[in-house]
Amino acid sequence: MEIKITTYVDNEKVHDEKYVGEYIVENTYEKIQYIDKNEKKIKIFIDKMKESVSIEKDNSKMSIEYSRKSSEYTTVYGIMKLDTQLVKINKLTRNNLVMHEIIYNIFFDQEKQQNKLKILVKNSGN
């Protein structure tokens, strides 16, 4: 599958990346996994029952739920403790395309930033 990930921070587009990876759909979850440009295995797990998202990289996992949650997550700056809160998850499908839009807040002391991931999965078999 072709996977295109666009990252926005406070509504400003900051990254646009394309990868080949896997997209798995089950009754209770959807999973997107790929190897990023730094050769790190990334897993994005969308739990349909809990309405939550987790992003795994380098044996670290960021859990994003509607209630504010703390996680230790590997970033370009090293391992950081991040407080996150899910704002919204949207899913749109058309023909051989699936787009997930995940909007969440990251809190830094008294400040917060809003991140948005647009994940477009294209079934290359069509």
Predicted regions and their residues:
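N-terminal intrinsically disordered, cationic/polar leader segments
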Residues: M1-S63, R68-E101, N105, Q114
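Edge beta-strand at a domain terminus
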Residues: D109-N126
